[in-house]
Swiss-Prot record:
Protein name: Polyprotein p69
Molecular function in Gene Ontology: cysteine-type endopeptidase activity
Residue ranges of domain Peptidase C7 in the record: 1-248
Keywords from the named record: Host-virus interaction, Hydrolase, Inhibition of host innate immune response by virus, Protease, Suppressor of RNA silencing, Thiol protease, Viral immunoevasion
S-S pairs: none
Organism of this sequence: Cryphonectria hypovirus 1 (strain Euro7)
InterPro entries (alphabetical): Peptidase_C7_dom
Pfam families per record: Peptidase_C7
Active site, per annotation: 162 (for papain-like protease p29 activity), 215 (for papain-like protease p29 activity)
Enzyme class label: hydrolase
Function: P40 protein is involved in reduction of conidiation of the host. Not necessary for replication. Also involved in reduction of orange pigmentation of the host.
Any Gene Ontology biological process: proteolysis
Length: 622
């Protein structure tokens, strides 16, 4: 798209000077490359000595220009009198930007587009439609073919083009090219008849600081079918009052329809009628709204759809299952969840296990995403084993399944703290630094807890403690006066209910995801004094699964009777758990398949008969 021409005279030196001394490449540059494109009307009229500014439609039709001069009025520079930097809006249309900056550019429109522009101008200037466009919901037939398929949102035009808000969006580009900024009233009345919109919102015509220049403010909130007719009436009244009036000072930057594209907002257009749907859709209907992350984004054109898709892809490579779950299912704080539905979860877990056992290895060991869970990765031993290895995404599938079945299919609303971003990694601290950080945090924690307890006691709360040792002392003191099942278990639960409550509260406020679960806190806690250490040791002895019972959480969370019931439903035999040396969190599972087969649940038996038959192997005695 570039034509070659002879180099301009300024570049070639006269023969008298020796060319080699001046420029060794003179002969190389025999042809000079110039970008094609017409001279703009702005430049042409400037060179003729006229005052450059958009012409009326009649003048533009009568104007004779030499070849190579385009007739687009969009290239005219906006006069300084009307420019208002503070309230002005930044256009996007390259020609408008160039004109606004006062830099003339070449016009690179195709010939065909120019011809169509001219036909449009002819049509609008010479005749009137049978029924005006602002009465019916779309431009009348003769103009319809001249409306581009490309929607011009108002964000693309800057100051001087506010009159476009009452014009059908598919005709805006053509109108802007044939009319330029600040349309004359007479021309505007014709434009409204040919390509005016029927409903665009309530409007207001204001005088600007420059005389004979008016500004249209449109409020898109309340749209009605009569907007177009009322507006036409108002403009014709204005024409009668002030025949020299021109409309189009600036777009109001606060108007709902205008927002620079960087803000990724979309103009709420009332859609035009298409052939498919015979009549205009409801006037108040908003555009399609698509969710991008947790933000809804309005979509009115293909361009917006592309933008939305791009934004989606930035946020999540794949469609984000967790976002779906967040929308569809109730979600519980994890510990509570397991405490409530342990038996059912484990049954489902076993069912999953048996399904997986029948699948080939490649399916059984799926490659996983970053493993960050609601229960910290470090605390995964608190989850049932099957779930301990799953990613949060896969786990949420299992949870959501039970959230529905257990709550009579009603998913209630609940708050979700989004998880830490798995893609962000930081350098691990050195051991010394880590220890230092931990001790520092612990010191702060203890001060915090003590302060909390102190405040609470001052308020008159009785069951608040500042440390484990104090918790155990108060518990033992209380148990002296009333029946207690087992002092230390109760002590542990006191620790849970009091100390942890404040911490969890803090973590929730800080927007963190993990709550400290009971037992993990007991195991991780570093004693602050000898007495504390002794107390802590005895608590740990009671809780140690190797010595006492199979399921730790149940023991701490409920009384012993509940625990026995839980133990029976889980059918975990009270033997010490054998730890696997390689992975400290992987417990060898006791009586894995026998567990469900011999349970007292009849329905279970019915379900399992086939599976049992499949797994029984009889010894063949030779």
């Amino acid at each position: 798209m570039s034509c070659l021409r002879k180099p301009s005279q300024s570049l070639v030196l006269s023969e008298s000077v020796d060319p080699t001394t001046v420029d060794p490449f003179v002969d190389v540059r025999a042809e000079e490359v110039v970008p094609t494109g017409c001279m703009t009307l702005w430049e042409y009229r400037d060179s003729c000595g006229d005052v450059p500014g958009p012409l009326s439609h009649g003048d533009l039709r009568r104007l004779r220009t030499p070849d190579g001069v385009c007739k687009c009025q969009i290239h005219f520079e906006f006069p300084t009198v009307l420019k208002s930097g503070s309230t002005g809006t930044v256009p996007e249309h390259p020609a408008v930007v160039a004109a606004f900056m006062g830099r003339p550019r070449r016009c690179s429109l195709e010939q065909r587009t120019k011809e169509l522009d001219f036909r449009f101008l002819q049509l609008v200037h010479e005749g009137l439609p049978v029924r005006p466009s602002y009465m019916i919901a779309r431009p009348p037939r003769p103009v319809r073919g001249l409306c581009s398929s490309r929607d011009g949102s108002l964000a693309q035009f800057g100051q001087g083009y506010c009159y476009l808000s009452a014009i059908v969006d598919s005709a805006r580009w053509r109108v802007a090219r044939t009319t330029g900024w600040c349309v004359r009233v007479a021309d505007y009345l014709r434009l409204l008849q040919w390509v005016g919109r029927r409903s665009f919102g309530s409007f207001q015509i204001e005088e600007s600081t420059v005389e004979h220049v008016y500004h249209v403010i449109v409020d898109t909130e309340h749209q009605s079918e009569q907007d177009g007719a009322l507006f036409y009436q108002a403009v014709s009244d204005l024409a009668a009052r002030d025949p020299l009036a021109r409309i189009g000072n600036q777009l109001n930057p606060l108007a709902a329809e205008f927002c620079p594209r960087s803000a990724r907002r979309v103009e709420p257009v009332t859609p035009q009628v298409t052939r498919r749907k015979g009549l205009a859709r409801m006037p108040g209907r908003s555009p399609t709204v698509v969710s991008v992350g947790n933000v809804g984004m309005a979509i009115t054109s293909i361009q917006d759809a592309l933008v939305a898709t791009e934004l989606r892809n930035v946020n999540f490579g794949r469609r984000d299952t967790e976002a779906e779950c967040r929308r569809l299912w109730a979600r519980y704080e994890v510990n509570d969840y397991f405490r409530r539905h342990k038996a059912e979860l484990l049954k489902f877990d076993a069912r999953l296990r048996s399904h997986m056992a029948k699948k080939p290895v490649s399916v059984r060991t799926r490659s996983s995403d970053a493993k960050i869970q609601c229960i910290g990765w470090r605390d995964r031993h608190l989850l049932p084993q099957r779930l301990a290895g799953l990613t949060k995404q896969k786990r949420s599938l299992i949870w959501s399944r039970f959230a529905t079945s257990n709550i009579r299919r009603k998913a209630s609303a609940c708050t979700m703290t989004p998880s830490v971003d798995p893609m962000v990694h930081t350098w691990g601290d050195s051991a010394a630094l880590a220890a230092k950080k931990i001790s520092e945090a612990r010191r702060r924690q203890e001060i915090c807890a003590a302060a909390y307890a102190e405040r609470a006691k001052a308020r008159g709360q009785t069951n608040v403690v500042a440390s484990i040792s104090e918790a155990i002392e108060t518990t033992l003191r209380r148990n002296g006066t009333r029946f207690a099942l087992d002092g230390l278990h109760v002590a542990a639960s006191v620790i849970v209910t009091t100390r942890l409550r404040s911490w969890n509260q803090e973590e929730v406020l800080a927007g963190r995801e993990f709550r400290k679960s009971t037992t993990s806190w007991i195991w991780r806690h570093m004693p602050s004094s000898i007495q504390d250490a002794l107390n802590l040791t005895s608590v740990r002895d009671k809780l140690d699964p190797g010595r006492a019972f199979g399921y730790v959480q149940a023991a701490v969370a409920q009384g012993m009777s509940d625990f026995r019931r839980a133990k029976r439903s889980l059918a975990i035999v009270a033997k010490p758990v054998i730890r696997n040396v390689r992975d400290p969190y992987d417990h060898g599972f006791v009586k894995r398949d026998g567990k469900l087969r011999h349970s007292r649940d009849v329905s279970n038996k019915k379900l399992r008969t086939k599976a049992v038959a499949a797994t029984k192997v009889h010894k063949i005695i030779f």
